[in-house]
Amino acid sequence: MKLFNIILLNSLFVLIIGCGGGGEATNPQEQIPSAPTVQPSAPDIDTWPSPSWEVVEPSEVNMDESKLKAALDYAFQAGRNTQSVVIVRHGVVVAERYKEGENKDTLATSWSGAKSFTSALIGLAIDQGYIGSVDDKACSYLERWSCEEVVCLSLDCPLSRPLISIRHILEMRSGLSPTDGISIYSDKDDQLLHSLERSILTKPGETYLYSNEDSMILSAIIRKATGLTTKDYAEKELFSKINMVGDWWTDKEGHTMTYCCIDSTPRNFARFGLLYARSGKWDGQQIISDYWYQESTKLADGLDNYGLHWWLYPSVNLIGALGLHTNDIWVYKDLDLIVVRNSVFTKYGTESVRTGQNIHVTTAPNNWNNTNFLSLVTDSIND
C-alpha cells in the first residue's frame, strides 16, 4: 500500500508539471477578451449576497437566457474539463452550471488567482497602518534580508536586495533569479526560505518575470507587518467581511502560500469578484480603500496587462484573478458582471498543508479560448 501511494504521488507531480506547474497561471495575454458589444448600465449597488446569494432569471438583469446558455454550453463541451461556472450581475446569480455529480457546495481551487487576494491583503495592511507604503523596502519587513546598502566604489557594483520594494514584488519585477516554477510547490518544505534565498540578477523594477516565489515573499511581509499569518489575516479582515469561506493552504513550516491555493466554492470566489466590481465596497462598507483599488488595478508602468498582482485589460475595463487551467475570476466593472470558471479539481491528502501526499490536481481545458467564452457572456446583455 505504501509503495502504491508513492507511485500515485509521483504520478500526480508528473501530471502537474506536464500541465504547466503548480499554481502557475496560464498566459492570459494570448487570449485578450474582446470588448462587450453593449453600453454599460449603472450597477444596482443595493443588492448583495448577505449572507446568501439570490438567484434570478437573466431577464431581470437585462440578460438573454438563451445566449447565457450558449456560454455555459461552450464551457461544458466535452474535453473542456469544466467543473463549474457561476455568472453574477448586479449582485445576483443569473446563471450557473456544475459538472455532473457536483453542486454549488463543491470545492474548487484558485491556483494563482490567490495572488489577487494577496494583493488585497497588502492593501488592507497599508490602509490599517501596518505597512507604510507599497513603495516601502521589502527588507524592512523581512528578517532574513538586511537593509544595509552595499558599499561599492567600482563601476560594476553588485545589485542588492535593499533595492527591492513591495511594489516591485507585486509587479513581478523584483529582479530576483528565476526558478522552474514547479519546485516551490512540489519539493520545498519551507517555501518561504526557498523564495527568500534567491540571488538578485537584474535591477529591481526593470524586468518583468512572473514568479511564484516573488508572491511567496509577501507571506512573510504580511506576517511581520500585521502579527498574523496571511491565512489568519485574510479570515479576519477579508473573508469575514464578505461572508466568504476559504481554506488557504500553507507549506510544511506554516507559511501561507500567497502565490496560490485557496480552496473554496465558485460562489465564494464570486464574492471576491463582486467586491472588486464595486470598487472595494461591500454592503455599505468600504473594505478595500478606493486608493488601493485604483492603485492595484491600474497597469504597472511599461507593462501591457499586469498591475499589482491583477491581470488587466483596460480597453474593456476588465480585471482578472487568474489561475492555472483557467481557474479564473473575471470582473467587468462597467457591467457589474462577474464570471467565475473552475476546472475539475481533486484534492489528495487530509490536510491543507503542502507536504507529503497533500496535493492539488486540476485538469486543463482543451480547445478553450477566453475571448470566445467571455464574448458569449457579454453578448447576452441587452442594456
Label every PLM stretch briefly.
Residues 20-103, 108, 126-132, 375-383:
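N-terminal leader/targeting segments and the immediately adjacent pre-domain N-terminus
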Residues 214-221, 260-281, 327-344:
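Active-site-proximal alpha-helical segments within enzyme catalytic domains
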Residues 91, 108-134, 169, 218-222, ...:
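Active-site SXXK
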Residues 246, 292-338:
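Active-site Gly/Thr loop motif
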Residues 30-38, 323-383:
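Structured C-terminal helix/loop/strand segments within mature extracytoplasmic catalytic/sensor domains
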Residues 128-174, 226-264:
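Active-site helix/loop module of the DD-peptidase/beta-lactamase fold
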Residues 157, 171-251:
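A small/polar active-site loop signature that marks catalytic segments
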Residues 15-18:
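C-terminal motif of bacterial Sec signal peptides marking the signal peptidase cleavage site
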